[in-house]
């Protein structure tokens, strides 16, 4: 079971790891690569000390320079082949079943699917819902990580729908409660 914390603050990353996050994804949007590398070093070091998988959002070059474990790419990011050449864990995003089928052809290590519920992090994007998540999970070969409005009250429902884990943004500071909910659902 995967608990993927998406963070832009080192204190939040530390709280998420202390709460049981298995992956930390550094999401610092619109930074030049050199600045992302500088900002990312403390996150990389924290994850390395904690034995947590470190993923960089959107920037393959920064992921490689930081020695990250992986990179998560959106539909517009590119860099899939470069990520493979660098042996990075590769995560791709999808918001619909159709998008999921298209990106599944790229053979990602995981697929981030959502938003499952409406979320201020992605305003204006229609929610997939649990039925849509279940359909998406059944349609693709890649393991699915549910994202979007996920917290301790609904994380287990994502596993029941077929996801192998969840990603949290706002709930990263409440990772312990999310982790407990996932562990209960796994039994």
Where are the predicted features?
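Short, glycine/charged-rich beta-strand-loop motifs at protein surfaces that mediate ligand recognition
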Residues: 120-124
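Conserved N-terminal beta1-alpha1 strand-loop-helix module at the mouth
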Residues: 1-110, 125-128, 135, 141-144, ...
């Amino acid at each position: 079971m995967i608990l993927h914390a998406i963070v832009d603050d080192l204190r939040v990353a530390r709280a998420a790891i202390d709460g049981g996050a298995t992956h930390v994804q550094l999401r610092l949007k619109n930074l030049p690569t050199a600045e992302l590398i500088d900002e990312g070093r403390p996150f990389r070091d924290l994850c390395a000390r904690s034995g947590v998988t470190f993923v960089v959002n959107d920037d393959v070059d920064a992921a490689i320079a930081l020695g990250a474990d992986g990179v998560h790419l959106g539909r517009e990011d590119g860099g899939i082949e470069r990520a493979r050449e660098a042996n990075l864990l590769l995560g791709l995003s999808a918001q619909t079943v159709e998008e999921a089928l298209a990106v599944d052809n790229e053979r990602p290590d995981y697929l981030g699917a959502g938003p499952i519920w409406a979320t201020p992090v992605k305003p204006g994007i229609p929610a997939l819902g649990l039925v849509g998540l279940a359909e998406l999970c059944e349609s693709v070969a890649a393991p699915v990580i549910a994202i979007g409005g996920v917290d301790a009250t609904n994380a287990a429902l994502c596993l029941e729908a077929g996801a192998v884990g969840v990603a949290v943004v706002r709930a990263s500071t409440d990772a312990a409660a999310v982790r407990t909910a996932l562990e209960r659902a796994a039994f």
